[in-house]
Amino acid sequence: MKICSFMLFLLFFINKANAGSIEMDYSISLGNFYGYTDYSSSTPLKYKTNNLNSSLNAYTKLSYNINYDYKASLISYIMIDTAKEVENYNQGYWGEEFFAEFESPTGVFTVGQDYNVAYNFSVGAPNAGPIKINNTELTNFITNPNWYKKGSKSSYKTLNSTYINTDGASFKLNYVTPSVLNTKLGFSYIPNTNSSAGLVSKDSLYYNDEAYVFGLYNYFYLKDYEIETSLGYGNYKNNSEEYSLGMSIYRKGWTLGASYLKTSAQTKKALLTLQDAYREGHAYNLGLSYEIGPLTTGIAYFNSKSDKFSNQNEIISFSNSYKYNKYTTLSLTLAKQNAKDDKTTKGYATILGLEFAL
């Protein structure tokens, strides 16, 4: 309701007298995945070896073009998932982003449930298929004792991404400058960092504290190479300070990318514990992909570690996707994960995917 009121205020205040145009954009996708997992003999417990997962994703954007320079929009992303759970990990059966956006010559403003500017700017290892290397859906097929989320309860003993995503899609205010010399700057203010898509548990002492995030994005051409870079900084009050950087290089179908995230705990209000050890740690990824016609193939590596505890994750994935037509995409992912807690959980997964898009 607050977002809708804000949107109506913008439309009324900026262009009361002039009639503009309205446009709408949308997309809907349905993903169906089957994964077979083989756990090593050293894995202490017996987990599921056959996992099915279906997800429905919908995007809508309703825009009012006030004039050539000004546009106001309402944007939503909705996700419904049938099986985001392997033993102890559940990212949530429902997820959403909903925010208002205002574009002007002075920049882009958004208010609502959205990711922070550093996250939105981030570049790194490319995704060659539906199973991403950051905040990976691989956890739907191979259990990970370092990442736990169920309902309002969560525990992250290591980082699950090289992008700043501690606040997830919580309510926030974002501002992004116009592009100058192919460079954009951004700022996010987050009044409450708890989010079902983030890392902060509602049981923590700092879950309702504010945060500030800054981001920088740049792209340029060097002969035949297209190069993207990103930098991010986040200050989560009483929680952590976070620094991120990333780079992506593209040439003739090939994409090489890498990114890094470092966190340092702020312990004045809440001491670091094993359950939120991501607050003092680091993560990096590296990936290479190649796209030719309807086929994309790639390999990616992800590593995250707690600096104060022995917990660590290592993921290697080989992904392939084939766009059969404009509506249908087939995929095959082979992945390996080592998750070190008090014991080591090691698993191998083969994941088949069938996706439909409108």
Where in the sequence are the language-model features?
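Detector for outer-membrane/organellar transmembrane beta-barrel domains
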Residues: 209-317
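Transmembrane beta-strands of outer-membrane beta-barrel pores
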Residues: 30-38, 66, 76-82, 115-117, ...
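Transmembrane beta-barrel outer-membrane domains
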Residues: 21, 47-55, 89-93, 164-168, ...
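Sec/Tat signal peptide C-region and signal peptidase I cleavage site
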Residues: 14-19
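Repeated loop/turn-to-beta-strand initiation elements of outer-membrane beta-barrel proteins
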Residues: 68-72, 106-110, 181-185, 222-229, ...
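Outer membrane beta-barrel
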Residues: 21-34, 49-194, 208, 218-220
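Outer-membrane beta-barrel architecture
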Residues: 59-61, 99-101, 174-176, 215-217, ...
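Outer-membrane beta-barrel "beta-signal"
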Residues: 104, 214, 346-358
